[in-house]
């Protein structure tokens, strides 16, 4: 048995192997400057991937350090010499093993075949070379060997024969294959003898070259198109750059479309605004012409109100088109219309203004229906001020409204106070019931009737209110016959408050109409 190599020989051997470009990166992850090796596959690994290989077991991968371990055998060195990252990559890809998971990859059929092949080639190299290392006398051969090795290996197994070279070249390269194998084994200075792996697959796959070339031409170009052994990264970067370029072009087109759509929308908006402005100018000129044609008082009123100068739309109302002077007429049937509405005012219909003391209908009588038909309980309504009609000339600016409202209230309160003085001029003392028209006798009469009927088993409304003839005669219905006095009082009070609120709301509507149409 030959002596084992010393530390110097081991360092020289691995220095030559690691100088090859394909061995400068980890076989599994591609990390730079790997310092560990898998003797089973003849590949170089980084420290992380070496730990993964250790976890697989020595029956699948035997790991050693190229820098720390000094007990290498000649068989192990020959396995590293005939192997290499490039040969392992080509073999795994050729047999369709592209998995990244270590368990899947090194338990596959391709890994088993490659382990057996490395063992056979290492044994043959050890038998031929023994303990000889590379010498400087044959250092000129490796310069030609890598080019021939890479070009022959990749082109022969990944592309059809018609693409690689003429038929004469293939026949020429096929014949010296055994001599290349023998020469590679005889001279270990040639580096990791790639021809040993390159020739045997060629001989076995030569009859099926065209079939393999037709099935996997594109995949072989993408995966092994580079000459440095890391073709996958190069091809993926090209594909990513192409996708990025297409994405940039699509983004530019989308931005251009958005800009064009926005520009068209702005142009259409500007055109519509110009058209509307032209229409407004035409309407303004028409209104100015109408204003110039007016005479005297009509023109002064139009200028004072500022109406008719500008028309908002084609259907807007203009005062200048049909301006007429409205003369206020004195209403003749004020009393009759008031008497017709007494019934509705009494039950809570909406009054024309806020509630006043003279509108309080809480005076009690024998029958509310009979009292509503008389004028004695509503004597104060005769002196009520006639409400003026609302016209365009009677509308005043906003600044004068508070003063006008106060004037109306002071005027009504003055009328009430003067009427009360005339009514109670000779009285020494008056009460609130007398002032507001409440009669105490009626209340006393109602209480006396209740006392009389306290012992009876059943009473009717006619017995309670003393309206026997009315119950059986005319058949008229009044609130006094339906609801008690207290409920009627509460009901009327609520209706009066609602009527007051509605009057205020109506006044606000008129003021808003004045504000809106008074600015034109």
From Swiss-Prot:
Subcellular localization, as worded in the UniProt entry: Cytoplasm; Golgi apparatus membrane
Polar residues compositional bias, start-end: 170-185
Compositional bias (Low complexity): 220-232
Gene Ontology BP annotations: COPI coating of Golgi vesicle; protein transport
Source superkingdom: Eukaryota
Membrane topology: Peripheral membrane protein
Ranges of residues in domain Arf-GAP: 11-127
Role of this protein: GTPase-activating protein (GAP) for ADP ribosylation factor 1 (ARF1). Implicated in coatomer-mediated protein transport between the Golgi complex and the endoplasmic reticulum. Hydrolysis of ARF1-bound GTP may lead to dissociation of coatomer from Golgi-derived membranes to allow fusion with target membranes.
PANTHER family: ADP-RIBOSYLATION FACTOR GTPASE ACTIVATING PROTEIN 3, ISOFORM H-RELATED, ADP-RIBOSYLATION FACTOR GTPASE-ACTIVATING PROTEIN 2
Known partners and oligomeric status: Interacts with the coatomer complex. Interacts with C-terminal appendage domain of COPG1.
Name this protein carries in UniProt: ADP-ribosylation factor GTPase-activating protein 2
